[in-house]
């Protein structure tokens, strides 16, 4: 029988449970909740269906399609390590589609080219023994295939999705939709028999980094977040675009909302920022803004980290090695064997430049 979704836990409740922030900062929590917005309907049947199972040289997979609301669905690729015994830590990896995170074209089941090997987080994680939920994100799970095909070039898909979301869920921002749907992917992962529900995390790049940051801050099931070059400062990237916060951002900034305050709500849970282009030294004030909360929560010195590879938007392999060692320590795993990254790095370096 399909399960029924319960209303999303409010930030104020999460604050009380997690002890996040100081009393003076708690009024900001309600403003974060208001900023993200709420779906028009919160009482809907949770349904998921298994579309297919398959095996690749790197992992065993189950592709699900599940509801994220009364009118929207998402594809979630559950990636299981070969030879898994017992339960393993799990990581949700949100992005435009599962393909680019798992490293395979899901239609043909053939490997993707090596040009973006460093961003194939799902593939990296499953090779280390994690159970991974590679989740499809807004805007592609808001529009039909026909709507995507008819969208103008450039940012047409994004604008079309933002317009549609404004009609169907007028209070919900694009960032709110991204966050909500990532948490539904975490529902699926936490219920998977292969995953250890006490050792869960989010990891994402760019849009996936934004999503992982917000979902991880809200979701107490997540013990850690790794976010790559998403632009933690308001002026670092396009937070003002209609598909993130749109016109609502101006009021948020006027009210004094800063991401360092949202990060403080994660304390003492772990946060690792991979910086490269949109994050860097300009991001440190946000981490410093949260540091007092981490100290007050008794977090260890490694709980809040940034690695700035200074080599552009794509993560460097050096930064990934640091992030994966850190993640293993946060989720109670031994030092990971990352030798496979060297081969991926070699392949990427040898790939024709586009």
Model feature map: region roles:
Residues 87, 94-183, 191, 234-240:
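Cap/lid segment of the alpha/beta-hydrolase catalytic domain
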Residues 1-9:
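Bacterial N-terminal signal peptides that target proteins for export
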Residues 194-206:
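Alpha/beta-hydrolase fold nucleophile elbow
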Residues 23-73, 82, 269-354:
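Alpha/beta-hydrolase-fold serine-hydrolase catalytic core, especially in secreted/extracellular enzymes
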Residues 12-25:
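Bacterial Sec-dependent signal peptides at the C-terminal "C-region" and cleavage site
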Residues 69-74, 82-91, 97-100:
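Proline/glycine-enriched tight loop/beta-turn segments at coil->beta junctions
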């Amino acid at each position: 029988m399909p399960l029924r979704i319960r209303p999303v836990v409010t930030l104020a409740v999460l604050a009380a449970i997690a002890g996040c922030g100081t009393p003076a900062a708690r009024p900001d929590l309600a403003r974060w909740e208001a900023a993200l917005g709420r779906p028009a309907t919160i009482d809907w049947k949770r349904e998921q269906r298994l579309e297919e199972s398959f095996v690749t040289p790197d992992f065993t997979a189950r592709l699900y399609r599940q509801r994220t609301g009364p009118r929207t669905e998402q594809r979630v690729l559950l990636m299981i390590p070969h030879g898994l015994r017992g339960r393993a830590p799990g990581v949700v990896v949100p992005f435009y589609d599962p393909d680019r995170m798992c490293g395979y074209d899901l239609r043909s089941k053939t490997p993707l080219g090596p040009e973006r090997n460093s961003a194939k987080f799902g593939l990296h994680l499953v090779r280390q023994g994690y159970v991974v939920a590679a989740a499809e994100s807004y805007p592609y799970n808001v529009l039909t295939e026909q709507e995507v095909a008819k969208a103008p070039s450039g940012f047409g898909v994004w604008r079309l999705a933002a317009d549609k979301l404004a009609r169907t869920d007028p209070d919900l921002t694009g960032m709110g939709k991204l966050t909500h749907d990532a948490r539904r992917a975490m529902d699926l992962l936490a219920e998977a028999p292969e995953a250890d529900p006490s050792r869960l995390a989010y990891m994402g790049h760019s849009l996936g980094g934004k999503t992982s940051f917000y979902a991880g801050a809200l979701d107490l099931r997540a013990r850690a977040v790794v976010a790559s070059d998403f632009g933690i400062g308001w002026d670092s990237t396009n937070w003002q675009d209609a598909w993130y916060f749109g016109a609502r951002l101006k009021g948020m900034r006027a009210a004094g909302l800063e991401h360092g305050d949202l990060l403080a709500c994660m304390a003492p849970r772990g946060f690792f920022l991979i910086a490269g282009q949109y994050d860097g030294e300009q991001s440190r004030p946000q981490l410093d803004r949260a540091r007092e909360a981490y100290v007050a929560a008794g977090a260890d010195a490694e709980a809040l980290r940034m690695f700035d590879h200074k080599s552009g938007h794509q993560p460097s392999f050096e930064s990934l090695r640091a992030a994966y060692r850190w993640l293993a320590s946060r989720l109670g795993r031994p030092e990971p064997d990352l030798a496979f990254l060297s081969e991926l790095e070699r392949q990427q370096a040898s790939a024709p430049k586009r």
